[in-house]
Amino acid sequence: MNISRVLFAVVLVLTVSTYECRPRGRILGGQDSKEKTWPFMASIQKNEVHQCGGVLISDKWVLSAAHCATDSNNSSLHVMLGAISLTKPEQYKIVLKVEREIPHPLYNSTKKHHDLLLLELSEKVTLSEAVKPLPFETENIDIPDGKRCLVAGWGQMKSTGKKPDTLQELWIPVISRDVCNRRNYYDNEITPNMICAIEAKKDSCEGDSGGPLVCDGIAVAIVQGGYRRCGLSKKPGIYTLIAPYKSWIMETMYNATLLPSPL
C-alpha cells in the first residue's frame, strides 16, 4: 500500500538567490477581507507581533515558509487563527502556542529553494465555520498561464507606511514559468517547484511571507519571495508549489505523532 496515500487519508480525517529574493507579503492593490472568508489563514506571531502568514492544513498543523523560522525556542511563538483584524476583539479569534517548527530539510536560505515550514500547534484546533483547514494540492499539475488565484496577508500595502490591521486579499494571475525565467525576469532562477504571479501594481510583497496562494478553493503554493521592489511587471512574486512536497508534509505530520512533546 502506498504510504503517502495512507498518510493523506489520515490528514483528511484529522482536518474534516541571485535574483535578490526577499520575504514577500505586502498586498499591493488588495482589499479588506470579510469575516469567515479566510478561515484557514494564520498569523504567525513572535512576542505578540505579526511576523508571517500561514495556512491551516489540519487541526494541529500550519504550513508556512521556511525563511519565517525563528531559530530560537518556541516560547514566544504563537499562531493566531480566525482573525481578520490583528488587534480588535473578534468572536472567533484564537491564539495557540507553537510546539514545533520544522523547516524542509533541504531548504536553501540563499536561493529560497524548498522554502516550506511546518508548525505543530500545542493543541488541536476546535474547528468552526471561522476556523478550519484548507485542502492543499497533491498532484503535480501545471497551473495555466493567466489563471487567477487569491492571496492574502497583513503586510504593508505601500512601499513605505503602516501595516494594515485588517487582512488584505487580492486576485492575481499566474505567469508561466517560461516567461518568469526569461532573462529580463528571473533569468532561469525559477525551479519546477516554484511559480510566479503578478498584475500591474498588484502583488504580494515584503513583510508577510508564508500565506497561501489559493486557486479554485485549494492551496497550491506558499508566498515565498521576489525582487527587492514589489509590483514591477517583470519582477513578479515567487511562490513555492505545495504538491511536490506532499510526501514530506504528510510524513512529517505522521512522524510527529510518534514523538514525545518537547519540554
Curated annotation (Swiss-Prot):
Highest taxon in the source lineage: Eukaryota
Domain Peptidase S1: 27-254
Gene3D superfamilies named among the record's database cross-references: Trypsin-like serine proteases
Secretion signal, residue range per the UniProt entry: 1-21
EC supergroup of this enzyme: hydrolase
InterPro entries (UniProt xref): Peptidase_S1_PA, Peptidase_S1_PA_chymotrypsin, Peptidase_S1A, Trypsin_dom, TRYPSIN_HIS, TRYPSIN_SER
Disulfide bridge map: 52-68, 149-215, 180-196, 205-230
Tissue: In the embryo, localizes to paraxial regions at the neurula stage and anterior ventral regions at the tailbud stage. From the late tailbud to tadpole stage, expressed along the forming blood vessels including the anterior cardinal veins, posterior cardinal veins, intersomitic veins, dorsal longitudinal anastomosing vessel, dorsal aorta, pronephric sinus and most prominently around the vascular vitelline network, where expression shows left-right asymmetry in the stage 42 embryo. Localizes to endothelial cells.
Active-site residues from the entry: 67 (charge relay system), 115 (charge relay system), 209 (charge relay system)
Alphabetized GO MF terms: serine-type endopeptidase activity
GO-annotated cellular components: extracellular space
PANTHER family listed in its UniProt record: COMPLEMENT FACTOR D, KALLIKREIN-RELATED
Function summary: Probable serine protease.
Additional comment: Was named 'ami' because of its expression pattern; 'ami' means 'mesh' or 'net' in Japanese.
Official protein name in the record: Serine protease ami
